[in-house]
């Protein structure tokens, strides 16, 4: 029979081990927490720097096709991660102007549908919370770089004149507003959200897109297992008419980064949404699919480009395709299950041409001058030449960056910023409304704009 002393020692050891386990879990959680963000740092609006972009390679990891994206499925938000005020399955018709009052004038056909408010000239001003760690900033920079390489969407640092902008902040989980709502609108990348694919997903909401499985034709492609859906959350799987969500001429995309994962809002861990097509999977968070890229460029009237699709590493999950996007009407109508990630022209979004800088200054928008008190400091730090901050510096610190030249000297630097400008000009793109602003910036010489 054990002595009272040994029994007490055993109980004490057990308690000590239990306390150790608790503190160990807390320490691990704290370490993980600080890897992504530190709430003890005062919240301030910052922008990404050259250092953040340079750290992409340092922190780069193999893109995971599927990740734990449970932070995207908040039952209190519309479709889990959409935070537009008052938006739900019952109010969405009014939200889109799809009511008898608005329908008389066909407003839903002109002002809304898939993105009811687009960002002007595809430029989305942004700020980022000071609470993010270097690792998180690099992952956000990596996602933004994907937009820069593959679309004409320009996430640019907020300037003093930008009233509407997104603020990327580590709030409660992952969420965004859809489209340009006005003012300072949050994009939350909190705990569980610092994955490139998840960041791309939330930013794509801000660009103006809803989820893929909300399409009117989704029942032809996926099956909803209602018996596995958490009670009271059935409306998170509603679908919406073409009056509200524009498919932009593309077929259903199983591989869209905007698609629900198989167990979204599951009450028992079993699939709530399953592909009808065999040998395909849904809910990937590695990055854009080809159709994601096409739809963004289609919606924002981006200039034509050639997209070469790379085969995914795991060919058992998806098939590979190669498409040439030749015009705004030539959509990649992929077959069921065919997805991929496109690589656009890497130079097409480069805003480091002298011509682009000069045009933005001499476009009649105001005097060529510094608009910030810290311009000289920023210029000395090299931000005038950085490809990541040159547009911001040109708009706000033109004088310190040496961009203020006499108007009569403008023609001396009139040039094309792209090698294919003459060919595009001969095709008539200089005078086409959807391309005119782009051609004015990149092909001023061929278009005789200077």
Swiss-Prot record:
Carbohydrate attachment sites? Answer: 68, 225, 431
- Write out the coiled-coil annotation as residue ranges: none
Q: Where does Zn(2+) bind?
A: 201, 205, 211
Where does the record locate the signal sequence feature? 1-31
| Cofactors that this protein relies on | Zn(2+)
Mention one GO molecular function.
zinc ion binding
Textual note on the cofactor = Binds 1 zinc ion per subunit.
The enzyme's first-digit EC class, named in words, is hydrolase
Q: Which GO terms describe its cellular component?
A: extracellular region
What domain of life does the native source organism fall in? Answer: Eukaryota
Task: Please name the catalytic residues of this protein.
Answer: 202
The EC number(s) this enzyme carries: 3.4.24.-
Domain ShKT span(s) in chain numbering: 368-404, 414-450
- Any one Gene Ontology BP term: proteolysis
In chain numbering, motif Cell attachment site lies across 349-351
Q: List the disulfide bonds.
A: 152-302, 174-193, 368-404, 375-397, 384-401, 414-450, 421-443, 430-447
SUPFAM superfamilies, alphabetically?
Metalloproteases ('zincins'), catalytic domain
The subcellular localization recorded is:
Secreted
Question: In this protein, which residues make up the domain named Peptidase M12A?
Answer: 110-303
Q: Which UniProt keywords apply?
A: Disulfide bond, Glycoprotein, Hydrolase, Metal-binding, Metalloprotease, Protease, Repeat, Secreted, Signal, Zinc, Zymogen
Its function, per the record, reads: Metalloprotease.
Return the protein name.
Answer: Zinc metalloproteinase nas-13
């Amino acid at each position: 029979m054990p002595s009272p002393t040994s029994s007490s020692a055993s109980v004490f050891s057990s308690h000590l081990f239990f306390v150790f386990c608790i503190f160990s879990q807390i320490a691990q959680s704290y370490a993980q927490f600080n890897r992504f963000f530190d709430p003890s740092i005062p919240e301030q609006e910052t922008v990404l720097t050259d250092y953040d972009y340079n750290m992409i390679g340092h922190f780069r990891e193999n893109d995971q096709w599927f990740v734990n994206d449970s932070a995207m499925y908040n039952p209190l938000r519309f479709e889990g991660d959409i935070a537009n005020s008052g938006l739900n399955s019952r109010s969405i018709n009014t939200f889109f102007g799809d009511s008898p009052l608005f329908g008389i004038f066909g407003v839903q056909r002109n002002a809304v549908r898939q993105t009811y408010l687009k960002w002007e000239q595809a430029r989305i001003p942004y700020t980022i919370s000071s609470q993010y760690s270097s690792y998180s900033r690099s992952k956000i920079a990596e996602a933004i770089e994907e937009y820069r390489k593959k679309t004409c969407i320009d996430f640019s640092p907020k300037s003093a004149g930008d009233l509407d902008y997104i603020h990327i902040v580590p709030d409660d989980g992952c969420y965004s507003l859809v489209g340009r709502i006005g003012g300072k609108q949050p994009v939350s990348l909190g705990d569980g959200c610092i994955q490139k694919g998840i960041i791309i997903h939330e930013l794509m909401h801000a660009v103006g897109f809803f989820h893929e499985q909300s399409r009117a034709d989704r029942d032809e492609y996926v099956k909803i297992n209602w018996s596995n859906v958490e009670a009271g959350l059935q409306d998170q799987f509603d679908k919406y008419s073409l009056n509200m969500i524009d498919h932009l001429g593309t077929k259903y995309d199983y591989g869209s980064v905007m698609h629900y994962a198989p167990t979204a809002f599951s009450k028992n861990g079993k699939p709530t949404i399953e592909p009808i097509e065999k040998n395909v999977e849904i809910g990937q968070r590695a990055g854009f699919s080809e159709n994601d890229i096409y739809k963004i460029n289609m919606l924002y009237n981006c200039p034509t480009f050639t997209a070469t699709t790379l085969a995914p590493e795991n060919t058992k999950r998806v098939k590979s395709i190669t498409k040439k996007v030749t015009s705004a009407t030539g959509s990649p109508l992929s077959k069921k299950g065919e997805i991929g990630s496109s690589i656009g022209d890497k130079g097409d979004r480069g805003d480091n041409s002298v011509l682009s800088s000069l045009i933005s200054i001499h476009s009649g928008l105001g005097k060529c001058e510094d608009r910030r008190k810290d311009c000289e400091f920023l210029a000395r730090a090299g931000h005038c030449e950085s490809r990541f901050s040159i547009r911001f510096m040109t708009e706000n610190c033109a004088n310190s960056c040496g961009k203020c030249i006499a108007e009569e000297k403008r023609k001396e630097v009139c040039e094309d910023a792209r090698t294919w400008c003459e060919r595009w000009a001969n095709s008539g793109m200089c005078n086409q409304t959807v391309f005119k602003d782009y051609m004015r910036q990149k092909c001023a010489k061929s278009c005789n704009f200077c």
